[in-house]
Amino acid sequence: MDLSAKDEFSAEKRNPDNYDSVNNPSGDWRVDSYPSENLISAGPASCSPSQMMDSFGQTLWYDPTSVQAVGYAGFNGGNASSSSFRGSIDRSLEMGWNLPNLLPPKGNGLFLPNASSFLPPSMAQFPADSGFIERAARFSLFSGGNFSDMVNQPLGNSEAIGLFLQGGGTMQGQCQSNELNVGEPHNDVSVAVKESTVRSSEQAKPNVPGSGNVSEDTQSSGGNGQKGRETSSNTKKRKRNGQKNSEAAQSHRSQQSEEEPDNNGDEKRNDEQSPNSPGKKSNSGKQQGKQSSDPPKDGYIHVRARRGQATNSHSLAERVRREKISERMKFLQDLVPGCNKVTGKAVMLDEIINYVQSLQRQVEFLSMKLATVNPQMDFNLEGLLAKDALQLRAGSSSTTPFPPNMSMAYPPLPHGFMQQTLSSIGRTITSPLSPMNGGFKRQETNGWEGDLQNVIHINYGAGDVTPDPQAAATASLPAANMKVEP
C-alpha cells in the first residue's frame, strides 16, 4: 500500500462525517443485481461489520434512479463516476491485484462495492465466495464473540477487524508472489484465498507455541518489508520465550520426579535401619504416633513440675506443722500402754481414745466412793457457821437454833455442846493438809478424837465431877498437836 492511501485513510479517520455517511446511507440506495460491466474493486476505506458482511452476497450497492445525483462517503456519483471507477481500478492494480483476475465468469460470484466507503485501508479485495465465508467461520475468525454482536457494533469488533487485516495482508502477498495471469481460471484465485485464510487463522492463535510462524517472503512481498521483518523478529522472540518457558517447566518436573524417588528411598532406608519392626508401614505409623504424642506429654510434665515447685516453696510452714504433729503422736504412743504395737495413725488414735475413756470411768467411780465416805464435805460450812453465830448472839439462852414448829427427831442438845463441836470442826478443817500418802486418814482420826474429848469434858462439867488434871490438860490442847498412836 502506498503513502497516498495511508494519508487518505488517516484523513477519513479524522473526519467523523465519513462514519456517519457510511453507517447511515440514504434511502435511495437498495440492494440489487449490478451489471458485470460496471464492476468496481475494493479499496482503502472504513465500514461497519454489518455492511461488510452484507457485501458477501450475490448483490451489490448501486443507485438505479440517478447515479449522477447521489454521492456516497464523500465521493460524488455525478459526471465524474467514470473517473472514480477508473481511480479505484488503478488503486487496486497498485495494491497487487490484476484486473483480469477480478472479473469473474458471467453468472458467478460478484465483487464488493466501491472501496472508498466499505473496507479498511489494509483490507485486500477478495471475491464474495460462500465457501470462503464458511471456511472463515470455521477457522475461528469470529470466535472472539457472537456474530450478531460484532455486526451490531458501530465500527465492528477490533479483534475481528485485526484478523481481517492480517488476512488481507497475507492475501496481498500471496497474490503478488504468485503473479496470477489473465488466462488462469477463477479456481486459482479461490485456492489462493483458501491458503491465505488458513495462514491468517494460524496467526490468530497467539497462545499456542509456533502460532506466529509466518514466512518473511509473504510479508515482505505485500509492500511492507520493514513491518514484516519486525513482526518476524517478534515472532522469533516469542518462540524463544516459549521454548525457554517449556524447557524450564520440563526441568522443574524432572527435578520433582527425581526428588520423589530419593525421598522414597530415604524412607525405605529408615524403615530398614529401625530395629524391632515386624512391618515397615506399621513401624512408620507407630513412630509418627509417638512423635506426635511426645510433645504434649513433655509440656504436661513441665507444667506439673512448675506447680510442684511452687507448692514446695510455699509449704514450709505446713511441713513444720506436720512434723510437730508427728512428734506429739509419738509422745502419746509412749503414754498409752500397748500403743507401740499398733501401726497406722488411724488405729493408734482409736487406741488413745479408748484409753482416755477408760480413765474417765475410773475417775467417776472414785469420786462416787469419796462422796459416800465423807458426805459433809459438800456443804458450805462457813455460811452455816456464820448464820449460827448470829442466831446465838441475838437470842436468849432458852432459844434454840431451830424454829419451835420444827419437829425434832432427837432431843435438843445443851448449849455448850453445840458451840464446842462447831469450833472443833472449824479447827480441823482449817488445819494444814498433810501429804497424800496417809494424810487423809490422820486428819480424820484427829478430828474424831478431838470431838470425843470435848464430849467427855462437857459431860464432866455438867455432872460437877472433877476430872483428872491430865485429862483436862490433854483436852485443852489443840487437836493439831496431838499424837496419833499406831
From Swiss-Prot:
CDD domains: bHLH_AtBPE_like. Keywords: DNA-binding, Growth regulation, Nucleus, Transcription, Transcription regulation. Its main location: nucleus. Transcriptional activator involved in cell elongation. Regulates the expression of a subset of genes involved in cell expansion by binding to the G-box motif. The keyword Ligase does not apply. Residues 1-17 have a biased composition (Basic and acidic residues). It comes from the Eukaryota. This is Transcription factor bHLH49. InterPro entries: bHLH_dom, bHLH_ZIP_TF, HLH_DNA-bd_sf. Residues 273-293 have a biased composition (Low complexity). Residues 198-221, 243-254 have a biased composition (Polar residues). One of its GO terms (cellular component) is nucleus. GO terms for biological process: regulation of DNA-templated transcription.
